[in-house]
Amino acid sequence: MCIRDSYKEDIALFAEMGFKTFRMSIAWSRIFPKGDEEEPNEEGLKFYEDVFKECKKYGIEPLVTITHFDCPMHLIKTYGGWKNRKMIDFYKRLVTVLFTRYKNLVKYWITFNEINMILHLPFMGAGLHFEENEDQTQAKYVSAHHELVASAWATKIAHEINPDNMIGCMMAAGNYYPYSCMPEDVWAALGKDRENMMFIDVQARGYYPNYALKFFEREGIHFDISDEDREILKNHTVDFISFSYYSSRCITTQEGVGETIGNAFKGTKNPYLKSSEWGWQIDPLGLRITMNTLYDRYQKPLFIVENGLGANDVLLEEEVDGYRVSDDYRISYLKEHIKAFKAAVEEDGVDLLGFTPWGCIDLVSASTGEMAKRYGFIYVDRHNDGSGTMQRYKKKSFYWYKDVIASNGEKL
């Protein structure tokens, strides 16, 4: 049983936990199978309409990511993915259909999932395939510009169709710490933060910052920024800033220092932090730091749309203390991160729209392609080799998070 067949049962489980919001994404190829068709696929549109209505039945607000590491293969093979400016028009057609069809069902939208990941996972982030001897850095930033312009167009179109729509950008967040107080390490950390912030600078402020323009000039990166691009970026900035946060990062200019593993963001191992099974360093205070950094910089509402712990959960043959899956490690991780964002809101004055953990149910991990790297409150009997019944089991964290929601975070 896949999510297509079981979404009603799964949404009922989310409602049992008390979900107020459910973050999901729309597969571009379900709406336009090739990506460049003139007319959408009604069957795909109807499927998502049914999903949204099922959410609404339980009082759950959909939070919809339009593009979540997916690009129709036809667009990659025929046009080169987001390297091609024609992608902007294909995307405009897609979002116009979505905003029109779901005008009364969806209010909160995210244009691109973790848009800065184009620099680290270019095929996932923008459908990029590089030819031999191709300037990959040039291709990444050309593609990024096309996505940024497309995002601004989506914001414009969304507000024209329904002024109540709330459109957000999204980044894979987590501040870089300098490994030492050496000025070179501090400078390196600033450079890495800017590398990621540039995407939000453009979407939240409406223009490329000077440091980015100087970087393009220095690196010989050239792409066409038309007057229309400048106008659309300037006048159609996002309503909120969403982000994923799993861990902070660390960097040094020194040699011989240990590196982190298991993450698309390569960095220096922080000796003050513990690590997950996959080498991601656990830093709840880093979430508070990241939130303050983003809010101070942009003064726009924030939305934490991914935060969680990937772990190798074990499904027991029989219940122990009432649970088939006892994931106290996940409860501990989420508890400390909830404390951190509560402090950011209550003590620091950060404007936070909401929090959606990653993920509510087990699914294949994007970073490793494994089912074994589980994040959900609900265990899905599916394994790396494809075996399993797909049966759902409530983990210990399911019941814990239900109490967290019911108490609005007071009972942790």
Which residue ranges define each predicted feature?
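Short, small-residue-biased leader/transition segments that mark boundaries at the very start
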Residues: 1-3
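N-terminal, well-ordered alpha-helical segments
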Residues: 5, 12-15, 46-53
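Active-site region of glycoside hydrolase catalytic domains
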Residues: 35-36, 46-412
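Catalytic domains of carbohydrate-active enzymes, especially glycoside hydrolases
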Residues: 6-27, 236-241
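Aromatic-lined carbohydrate-binding/catalytic grooves of carbohydrate-active enzymes
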Residues: 17-44, 64-67, 78
